[in-house]
Design a protein with these regions (language model features):
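Phosphoinositide-dependent membrane-docking surfaces
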Residues: 116-128, 251-265
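Short C-terminal boundary/hinge segments that cap the last helix of small helical domains
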Residues: 34-51
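Recognition helix of helix-turn-helix/homeodomain-like DNA-binding domains
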Residues: 6-21, 43
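Short alpha-helical "recognition helix" segments of helix-turn-helix
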Residues: 1-4, 29
């Protein structure tokens, strides 16, 4: 890690022992481990997303398992003839197996994708591991991310655009993000969509896109939290709200939704802010 980040071993020892690292240092450590700052600080609400192949650390408690790329999930909403494809970790695949019969399911995916599924409005789910080949072999129109971008890149995108303080984002990480932007042909508008874009798949086949402007009163966070933690035992209203672009207040009926595609880091950070005491206890 020291060789990759340029942070001295003694400084890394201090951080590991509990001394506070700068945000830039934590981000550089996270990029060296192909994960997020939330993960290395133990404040990830969703399972770690490791942007590498062949990593699986099996622990006694499934909640603490760490895994990397497993394969791909294809989701076919009702009244649609187009699968939506996403890259998932082995831990995500195990959770899908456990929760597949729930009314609602939350699926953390790689490349900063988080899915909310209303299973009553999902026609079919396809799971393909490495041995099955690529989704394009069964879906010629497949559009798929490879899952190779560490979550810390998405955490730092806004600062990449606007922040000059090297205690928040290092030149090294800015260069890495710049390379990802070139490879993926991201423009500034694309970056904003990566940070807070939402795609809504309705059960009549209509698809809408928007940008989240998170408000602490938005109960989309409660919807995701309850579905992920409590499953069918959670309490759900008929509708949920979110604040969209230009501060537009949106109210959606859950039974009219097939799927929500959300930005994982944005949702995780806001869930942490709202539920911090419940999740991590008092400092």
């Amino acid at each position: 890690i020291s060789n990759i980040t340029g942070i001295s071993e003694s400084r890394l020892d201090d951080i590991e022992a509990g001394k506070e690292g700068t945000l830039a240092e934590m981000r550089d450590i996270a990029i060296s481990l192909s994960t997020s700052v939330n993960v290395i600080q133990g404040e990830n609400f969703f399972p770690p997303q490791i942007a590498e192949w062949g990593i699986f650390i099996d622990k006694e408690n499934r909640d603490t398992e760490i895994s990397s790329f497993w394969g791909n999930i294809g989701i076919l909403p009702v009244n649609s003839d187009k699968y939506q494809w996403f890259t998932i970790t082995e831990r995500a695949k195990l959770d899908i197996d456990v929760n597949i019969n729930n009314k609602f399911m939350v699926v953390p995916c790689m490349n900063n994708k988080l899915l909310f599924l209303n299973m009553e409005n999902i026609k079919r789910i396809v799971l393909l591991d490495e041995a099955c080949g690529l989704p394009s072999q069964i879906d010629k129109n497949c559009v798929l991310d490879e899952g190779e971008i560490p979550l810390v890149v998405y955490e730092a995108l806004s600062d990449y655009l606007f922040e000059k303080d090297e205690k928040k984002i290092s030149k090294k990480l800015k260069k890495i993000i710049h390379n990802y932007m070139n490879v993926n042909k991201w423009l500034e508008e694309d970056i904003i969509d990566q940070i807070n874009g939402i795609t809504i798949f309705y059960n009549d086949g209509i698809v809408e896109t928007d940008r989240l402007e998170m408000d602490n009163q938005d109960d989309i966070l409660d919807l995701i939290f309850n579905a992920y933690i409590y499953g069918d035992d959670g309490y759900y209203d008929r509708a949920f709200s979110y604040t969209g672009e230009d501060q537009v207040q949106n109210r959606l009926l859950i039974n009219q939704i097939s799927m929500l595609q959300l930005p994982l880091i944005e949702i995780e950070n806001n869930i942490n802010d709202r539920y911090y005491e419940e999740l991590y206890g008092l400092n």
